[in-house]
Amino acid sequence: MNSALLRISAAFAVALCAAVPVPAAAQHRVGHAAMVYVSKAGAADLYEIQASQMATRRARRPQVRDFAQMLIADHTHSTQMVSEAAHSDGLNPRPPVLERSQRMMLRQLEAARDRDFDRLYLSQQIPAHVQGLALHRAYARRGEGAALRRTAGEIVPVVEHHLARARELAPMR
């Protein structure tokens, strides 16, 4: 009798576990590639924000200061978008951290003479946005996690606009 009761209890417990819905985030877990994307996108945004904050104070040309303000707003927003998408895809990302090359570029900006600042800032923005564009395009095409892929695709036109604007401003002296 005890054996039959145990079997029935075990069968009931298994059925109960199978009936409990699994949260959507747990069903769509993403892996290492997603974390790398989130980390690189966050680092790129952090660099853009910090470099542009410096440009709002040091740039001589008003067009460069306006460009910097746009970058601060847009990259702050994209950081939030990527973080929300990562959470939707079941990740718990760490706060962004600058890469070594980005820290070096910020040090170069800090050390630049006032008359050289605009040129140096814009010369950094072009390759930084080329890299960012490649990152977001690639992830939008082949990345893990539907929310992160969609977000990467939404960020692409913003980065394209930044790159075009940086190229427009760069030849101006």
Regions found by a protein language model. Give the residues of each.
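His/Met- and acidic-residue-enriched segments that coordinate or traffic transition-metal cofactors
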Residues: N2-A10, A19-R173
